Amino acid sequence: MAVLLDPEIGMPLNQLGTLCGRSNSSADAAFFYLLCLSAVHPFEGAKDNLQILFERNEKRFLELTKQQTKNRNDKASNREIRRFLVEFLHVAHQLLESNNIGQIQESGQQTLNDFNACMFYQNDSILSDDLVFKLLSISMMLVDRILRTRSRTVKQTILFAGIAFAVALFSHVVNHAIIRLQNAFYQLHDARTKTNENDSGEEEERRQ
């Protein structure tokens, strides 16, 4: 309610992030913390909360790296999506703190590949439209944070990487939107064709 009354104040957004806890592998919380820091009147405590979130996520990322060779062929959709979310937050953390552009680009590309694969999961998938919106928003807010917080010596290079990551993420979403629209049109066409065939068959039977 406080957010609706005065969206320029960041504190309620920080509280929403805290309430989200580890929902969607902490991606929901990261969204609200970054949104809080992007507000006209940010709540500075969100920085610490975001840092704690990133540190916790790094531990999970290292665990996933150790298990990668063992579980890479696991096709359980939600497990794949949770792993992607951990990778996504790892890239976000790198964009805000790492100076290793090569590592950022490598991690970013792997994360984008996994995102593309996860977007093909539709039935009973935890990668909902709401979550995709939050991920896209995070990618844009990361660019804003890079502009505000990174040092001049690395800002331009990291900024380029952040923009490239956000644009690629958007392009994957647009591509999958087109694929799903095409599939919907094909299904509608097939349903109409089948209905017409049934109607023709019934009419033929009546004539006989």
Where are these regions (language model features)?
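Alpha-helical solenoid repeat scaffolds, predominantly canonical TPR units
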Residues: 5, 13, 32-33
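Conserved structural position within tetratricopeptide repeats
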Residues: 3-4, 37-38
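Extended alpha-helical solenoid scaffold regions that build the rod-like backbones
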Residues: 9, 61-208
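Boundary/linker segments of alpha-helical solenoid repeat arrays
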Residues: 10-13, 38-52, 61
